[in-house]
């Protein structure tokens, strides 16, 4: 990858700008925040998370992006193509300051093979979801969605209570690292298997995992002790899940909940085959890509066979959106899709309400600014008990990574309310600098991903990606600060298209108008999408909240 080992990137903080406006300054700080070593998985290679999800195509492009943002006027827009800055256009003050298109390929050519060829030539970059769109906030970014999934699983299968229950999972990377803490927040014990010891160490340091077991017997003894006491604890175990899951079956261990967040979306760089360490896998990959891919696919097949066996033994089993089932099916596991994805199982009712991951970042770098926003959120939504519980636990347990940030799931109507309130806090000087508001591309109306967010849609429209494109167009029209349109995030090349928006609350009247437009229209796309697919809940929400569908 030609990494730059000596270079350490961190976002500037404070209320002094180096750019010509706070909107440009926000993008300038957030791309650098994505590469802060406490956030990024491999910052020396510009890799933020998710296998090879990058913030910029190469170091030259990264430097040019920073230079361009410093020069950018308040009525200009920077264009970025797969992590490479292309040019600056005169637009207008309410237009986005940056428009990004990452990893997009014509469908017939949308394969890892073709992408890898282009990547080798320096013509492409994998943007994942929030890596190439500059709004990754570390593992907290996914944690509330994971928490919501576990809590909903508890509601559906365990009478609303996960106390004394065990969640078994694998993968402690940028996304998967949220699982142990989310499980503990939901009241369960978590056993998380991870092949890379540096990732385990990182999660331990940031308090996302409580303990590390020395071996499988030690892990099981700890789990037994904590579940008997009704204590919620998370334990990491170094190992390969393709091996460990079968050892657990031999030991007659069946968890209550079973899922996986290894980097199966990228079989070449993300998933480590059975029998290899991170180092030996790297050598193997460099020596023989074809043989490596076969080994990875064989391991994924074995991994999924173990999951299916545990499902048959009573474990509530679901896919966590990394495309593991599809890989296993390609490797010969015909019934790999016998267990559902997490969205149809637990998240879709939230999507019907225009609910999704609303995140905000304090550009000042001062953690107290997030404390101020947390308190303001409590006053704004006193009736949302799960949200209040989440804010309390997040304050207590979540270590900030890079610029201080918070995430929570908010519905249609609530997002605009929160955005305007943040803008007011900036205007009144209650926070020390503007606030950046964004979200994951995993949202109610911004993604087409038939093996994840749009799996098993009621009307069979799983693969229709017009909605993601419309979402990007709508957010551009409404004046988001930067808008991104990506391909392949979460599940890999050929399997998804998705859009993101980021908007800055700088305390001005103009910002208030933009915030109201963007934070209303963005979740409205989710209500439209699900209403169109025939979901009654989306129909009811549209009627109740005045969403102007032409099909009510």
UniProtKB/Swiss-Prot annotation:
PROSITE patterns: UROCANASE (PS01233). Transmembrane segments: none annotated. Its cofactor is NAD(+). It is found in: Cytoplasm. It comes from the Bacteria. The active site is at residue 408. Binds 1 NAD(+) per subunit. GO terms for biological process: L-histidine catabolic process to glutamate and formamide; L-histidine catabolic process to glutamate and formate. Keywords: Cytoplasm, Histidine metabolism, Lyase, NAD. Its EC number is 4.2.1.49. GO terms for cellular component: cytoplasm. It holds the Pfam family Urocanase. Belongs to the urocanase family. This is Urocanate hydratase. It comes from Bdellovibrio bacteriovorus (strain ATCC 15356 / DSM 50701 / NCIMB 9529 / HD100).
């Amino acid at each position: 990858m030609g990494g730059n080992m000596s270079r350490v990137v961190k976002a500037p903080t404070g209320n002094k700008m180096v750019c010509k406006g706070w909107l440009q300054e926000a993008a300038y700080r957030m791309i650098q925040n994505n590469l802060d070593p406490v956030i990024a998985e491999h910052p020396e290679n510009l890799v933020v998370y998710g296998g090879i999800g990058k913030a910029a195509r190469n170091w030259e492009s990264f430097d040019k992006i920073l230079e361009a943002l410093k020069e950018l006027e308040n009525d200009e827009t920077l264009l970025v193509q797969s992590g490479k800055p292309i040019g600056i256009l005169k637009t207008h003050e309410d237009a986005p300051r940056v428009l990004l298109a990452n990893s997009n390929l014509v469908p017939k050519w949308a394969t890892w093979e073709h992408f890898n060829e282009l990547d080798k030539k320096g013509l492409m970059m994998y943007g994942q979801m929030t890596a190439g769109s500059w709004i990754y906030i570390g593992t907290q970014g996914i944690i509330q969605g994971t928490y919501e999934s576990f809590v909903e699983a508890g509601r559906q299968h365990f009478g609303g209570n996960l106390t004394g229950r065990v969640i078994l999972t694998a993968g402690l990377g940028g996304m998967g690292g949220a699982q142990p803490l989310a499980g503990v927040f939901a009241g369960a014990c978590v056993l998380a298997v991870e092949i890379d010891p540096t990732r385990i160490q990182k999660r331990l340091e940031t308090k996302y995992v409580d303990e590390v077991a020395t071996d499988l017997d030690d892990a099981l003894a700890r789990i037994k002790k904590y579940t008997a006491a009704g204590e919620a604890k998370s334990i990491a175990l170094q190992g390969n899940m393709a091996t460990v899951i079968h050892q657990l079956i031999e030991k007659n261990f069946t968890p209550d909940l079973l899922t996986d967040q290894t980097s199966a979306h990228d079989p070449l760089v993300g998933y480590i085959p059975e029998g290899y360490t991170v180092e030996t896998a790297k050598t193997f990959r460099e020596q023989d890509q074809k043989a490596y891919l076969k080994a990875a696919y064989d391991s994924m097949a074995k991994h999924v066979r173990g999951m299916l066996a545990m499902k048959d033994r009573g474990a509530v089993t679901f896919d966590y959106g990394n495309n593991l089932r599809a890989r296993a099916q390609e490797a010969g596991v015909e019934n790999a899709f016998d267990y559902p994805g997490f969205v149809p199982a637990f998240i879709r009712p939230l999507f019907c309400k225009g609910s999704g991951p609303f995140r905000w970042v304090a550009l000042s770098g001062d953690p107290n600014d997030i404390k101020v926003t947390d308190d303001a959120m409590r006053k704004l939504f006193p009736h949302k008990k799960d949200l209040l519980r989440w804010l309390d636990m997040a304050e207590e347990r979540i270590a900030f990574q890079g610029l201080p940030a918070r995430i929570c799931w908010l519905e249609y109507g609530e997002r605009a309310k929160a955005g305007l309130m943040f803008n007011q806090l900036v205007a009144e000087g209650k926070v020390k600098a503007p606030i950046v508001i964004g979200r994951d591309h995993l949202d109610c109306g911004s993604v087409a991903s038939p093996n994840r967010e749009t799996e098993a849609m009621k009307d069979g429209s799983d693969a229709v990606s017009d909605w993601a494109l419309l979402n990007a167009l709508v957010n551009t029209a409404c004046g988001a600060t930067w808008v991104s349109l990506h391909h392949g995030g979460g599940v890999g090349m050929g399997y998804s298209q998705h859009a993101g928006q980021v908007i800055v609350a700088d305390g001005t009247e103009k910002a208030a108008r933009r915030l109201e437009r963007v934070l209303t229209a963005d979740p409205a796309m989710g209500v439209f999408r699900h209403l169109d697919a025939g979901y009654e809940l989306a129909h009811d929400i549209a009627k109740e909240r005045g969403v102007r569908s032409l099909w009510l």
